[in-house]
Amino acid sequence: MKRRRKRYSAQSPKWMVTFADLVTLILVFFILLFSMSSVDNQKFQTVVNSLTSGGSLASVEKSQQSQKLDNILAKVQGYLKENKLQHVITAKRDERGVVLILQEQVLFETGQADILKKGTPFLDELGRLFSTIPNDIKVEGHTDNRPIHTYAYPSNWELSAARASGVIRYLTNHFSLSANRFEALGYGDTKPLVPNTSNDNLQKNRRVEIIISDPEAQ
């Protein structure tokens, strides 16, 4: 009597077929996405490097924001150098973003808040720059510690606030910039850069600071 041999089905379990189909569909989907878009090699490499080094997409975005601020800083510094303004305008990076420090004589007469005509070319350059970026802008007015008491400006608080507001008013009046992006702050003599112990130091403390805000710091 012949022994019957058991037949084994070569057919895979149903769940494996379904899983294989799903993987195939996902692969086709990403191939289509890749073929329909142009890949920025630099950004792609940034993402790869970040993920392979234990980073995340959030850290990639933060790195890109930092690079954009560095580019803004370089552009402003180039303008200052080209126009020989480094002795009265300083540009730097700190935790707030890109900070521009304009000494009083760039924009104002001492004790006044009306913008001088000689200061408008730099404000125009800033207006064109701000039109190309989405960052919020803070404008701070600062004075030295010598008291002022006039009808228009009873104290340094009013003078510093009027100067900050005047800069914003000029930019929003001359360029298509939303006022919602701006914040005016008047600090009076409460935040000196240096001690008010000499005429040179007094002059350094009379200033306007324009901060191109870092989105990560907001």
Curated annotation (Swiss-Prot):
Parts of the chain that traverse the membrane: 15-35
Membrane topology annotation: Single-pass type II membrane protein
GO cellular component, one term: plasma membrane
Subcellular location field: Cell membrane
UniProt xrefs under PROSITE patterns: OMPA_2
Spans within the Cytoplasmic topological domain: 1-14
Annotated ranges, domain OmpA-like: 95-216
This protein's UniProt keywords: Cell membrane, Membrane, Transmembrane, Transmembrane helix, Transport
Major subcellular site: membrane
Extracellular side: 36-218
Pfam entry (one): MotB_plug
Entries under NCBIfam families matching the protein: PRK06925.1
Family of the protein in this entry: Belongs to the MotB family.
Function, in words: May be involved in some transport function.
Protein name in UniProt: Uncharacterized 24.6 kDa protein in ccpA 3'region
Organism: Priestia megaterium (Bacillus megaterium)
Annotated gene: ytxE
